[in-house]
Each structure stands twice: as structure tokens, then as C-alpha cells.
Amino acid sequence: MDYLQKKSIRSVAAAIAGFLRHCVRKIGITREKLPSCIALAVCPLVTFYLFEMYTHNPFTTMHFKTQILNMAFYVLTALLLFGIVKYVRVALMLQTAFFMAAGLANYYVLNFRSAPIMPWDIYSIGTAASVAGNFNYTLKGSTVLVIIGFLILLLIESRFHMKTPARVAKRAALILLSMALIYGYTGMVQSESFVRNFGLYDKLFTPTVMNKRDGNIVAFLMELEYMDVEKPSGYSPEETGSKYTQAGQDSAGLTAAVEDPESVKRSNIIVIMDEAFSDLAVRGDFTTNEDYMPFIHRLQQGAENTRTGYLNVSVLGGNTANTEFEFLTGNTIGFLPQGSVAYQQYVQKETPSLASYLKELDYHTVAIHPYYASGWDRDRVYPLLGFDEFLSQDDFTNPKRIRNYISDESSFAKIIELYENKKEGEPLFVFNVTMQNHSGYEEEFHNFTPDITVDGIDSKALSMYLSLVKQTDSALQGLIDYFSQADEDTMIVFFGDHQPTTYVSNPILRNNKVNPETLTDEENLLKYKVPYVIWSNFDIEEQTDGETSANYLAMDVLENCDLPLPALQSSLTGLRKEYPVISAAGVREADGTLTTVKQCGEALNDYRSLEYYLLFDYER
């Protein structure tokens, strides 16, 4: 431990010790009050350890100095509560009950989406509640023991009866000092110099590791700093707006196409972002009783008028809306706070997107999501992105269901229905976000029996997931078969929004002798890869080894449809050659080097400025 680290620890310890001495003097410790004072110092520490044990063993994942750092917060909040509620037992029991409930919630969230609770999840409560009934809430034995530990602690805390000083001034002093120290503590753990000198783990794109190493509270407070999007260095809305306008003017054929849409070829464009669809073979080798995606695997071997490859996305196991945000807008989540949901936080006005651009070309733009319309605020956001129409589960009549969700087969049938009933001569753009493959994967259902098994791996979740993927593969084949016979030129774009939560894929890693807890940066990036397919019933150049990211994929769609690129995509053509993959999970340089958005720094500043402008300063 270097000098600065030791100095940081001593500073924290000295501040808290001085504060406690002040409290002792003000309260006036007597023999009767001594047990309560000890409880006020010790019980918060027990609460800390129990809270961490919901998800990991802090004695093995956290340095002792980091444990001390976390304990300080618990002691300070206990003192603050003591000042507010007057009774030590009430203060301690309130703190313990809160962390017992919050820890259990964090345990479930981590299991369901492979990421802990983060500050931005407050925006997602409604969406989470809508799918809450589809998960398995069985507790592990170790988790039950943690809950029992909390209950015992609550019982012990109920026996202490010390009150705060009767004088209002002393209580106020205790409250104000506690608040001041908590405020200072928060600022300290958000300080880059403290994080660096203390040795905290600050890789926000791996929040699970961050929580295990830094502790849940310290990690949460560090993440709070990123609630707001900082302006890029040297940002000027006037200058950036001028660059954006110029990029549109420089895009070959864009102005003419917008002024006279009939002057360009306008094929129907169908985009399917399939829920949790991925090929877990990218994580490691495994053998199944039969191919779980035979149709897509055949396309990946090479097919006429077909382009296949892998898409790098910014999310894992959840936050679906961020992948659609990247695809539709051309922006990247990599410039936004880790864990944020762009739809709910940043799309508050009309925002340029693929839908709004195609609408300018007189396309009829339709979004489909066969679940609740309010999920991720889609019913509010889609009109702002330029969609003419939004069809949710309420617009399906007697659809086929797999488990509790509308099947991909029925979801794709809705696309065919739209095509067959569209106005003659009006091109159609459909963006379909499916639900069939949504987690969880451990329940049994009367209407679906998994038929894929994995040799040497006994995992109900993995078997369920691969069996669902097979259903999607079959539905996609049916859709492409239909449009291969269609009279109008049509392109179908298919990709997954993210891989499933890691409890599905971890058995594959372990079967390949890979520890999921000690992945290299390259291995970690594999968690963010999903396959994509671009197919058309007209001539396009074939490809089988594509590697891109969600923010760039719409460029491929437009270019292969012979449509001009809109302003943002036009401005990114040069950058894409230097950085063919940009996501929150990682950046791939042209020579194959893996880096991060943060490490790229000024190299991405023009892109960052354009994104900031479009989200916060752009006006149509």
C-alpha cells in the first residue's frame, strides 16, 4: 500500500473517529448507555457484511481497506438516522430493514440480468414490474442464511433504548454533522484521484465486478457521478450544428432524395430486433442433440443476396431499449452514463432516426412490440423518433404464445399482414422488437417443452434458451421464404438485442475450463456479440464475416438499399474505417486493437459532440 493510499485511509478514519468522539461528548456516555453506543458502532458493520453476502463473500472479493471504507458509510448513515428518529433501536432497525430489502432486490436483479442495481434503474421500475411475474424467485440456501442473519440482527437491535439528547440544538448538530460527512464521503469516492490512489475498481462497463471489489454502496455512489451527461470538451452547439448540417449537404444524393422521394429506389425495409437472440457458440464450444439455429447457420456459410456477421452491442441480459436506440439513431451508449436508458432519460424531443429519415422519403413507418406499449416508454418515444404507427400486444388477435409471450411466428405474421394491407406504391419500414425469448428460462410451461439438450451440461436454463432460439430460427426462415416470393423489393434485417443473462451461458464457459469471474478483456467482449443477417429478394453484395456495432448497422442497411446516408451516418463513414466497432462494452480499432471509449479520448470527440447535439440541442 503506497503513501497516498495510507493517507486516504487515515484521513477517513480520523474524520469518523473525531466525529464519534464529538457524539460521545455531546450524548454523555453513562454505564446504561454504553451498550447502545457499542451497538450504534457495531450493528452497521454487521449490516454491511450481510448486505454484501447476498451476492458475494466480501472477505474474499474485497480488500480490508475497502471493507473499512464501506463500513464508514454505514456508521454515518446510522448516526444520521439516530439524530432524526431519536431512538437508537429505531435508527438501527430502519437501516437494517432497508438493506435487508435492498440487498434481496439486488440479488434478484443480478440473477435476472447479470448486473446489479444501478442509479438509473429508477427509470426502469415500470418495465421491470411488467415482466416480474416471469422469473424464478427460488432462494439459494446461502441467501436464506443471510435473511436469517438480518432477522437475528433486527431482534438484537430492538433491545437498545438510548435516545438522542433532548436539546434540539444537539440533535440538529448531530444531523448536520452526519449529513456533512456523508456529503464529503460521497464526493471523496467520486474523486478520480481518490479512486486511483485508494485502488478502487472503476471499470463501469463491468458493474458486477465493480460491486464485488468496491462494495455495493461505494460502487453505487461512484456511479451516481455519471447520472448527467457531460458536455464534450470544446463543445459548441452552433459549431456542431453547422457540422451536422454540412454533413447532410455533403451526403451524395441526400438533398435530392428528400426533395423528391420518388427519384430514388425505395425498397421495403423490415428490421427485426429479436429479444435475447444470440449464438452462444461465441462463448465456447458445446455440442447439442440437434442444431439450434440451422437456418441462420446455413446463411452464415454463404447465401445469395445475404450478408451475415456479428453485431457488438452495449448491453447484456437486459436494457433492450439501448440496442434499438443505437440502431435507430446511430448514436452510441458508449458516450452515455453506464447503465442509463437513453429512451427514458435522453429522448425527450424529436430526435433524428432511421424512422424519421425514411419517413422523409415517404415511407410508412411502423414499430411493433408484442408486449406492453409502455415498456421503456416506447409509446412516448416512438413518435419522437418518427414512427407513424406503433402496434403492441393489444393489436394482436389470438396470437400463438410460447411460455407467457407472443411467439416470434405470430410477431412475424403481423409483418406479413402489414405488407399485404399497405397502400399500393407506398414503401414500408417495419421495426419489430420481439418478446418470445425473454428471460427467465428455468420455469416449466404447459405450452412449451424444450427439445434441445447439451452434451455434458445439465442446465435447464440453457436447454430452454437454445430451444427458444430454434423456434426463432424457424420463424425467420418462414418469413424469408414468404418474401422470397413477394413482388416488391424487400430487405429483411435480423439481429439480437443482447445475449441472455450469464446464468444461461456460464455453464458453457465452465465446460470449456473458463472461469466466468476471471475473463480477459477479449473474453468479456464476447458477452456482447450477437449474430446479424441482412437478406433481400433483390441483388446485394454477399458477405459472411461482417463485424460491426449497433450504431453502424443502419448504414449497411441504407447502403445496400442504394439510399443516401442521412447527416449523422454520413459524418461517421470516415470514423468507421478507423473504429469499425464502437460500443459501451469496447471499441475495436482498424488493426484489431481492443480499447474503450474512455481510452480513445479526443479521437471520438467529434462523434461525441454530434451525439450530444442531437440529444440536447437539436431542433427540427
Question: What residue spans do the PLM features occupy?
Answer:
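General structural signal for secondary-structure boundaries
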Residues: 113-119, 137-141, 233-247, 320, ...
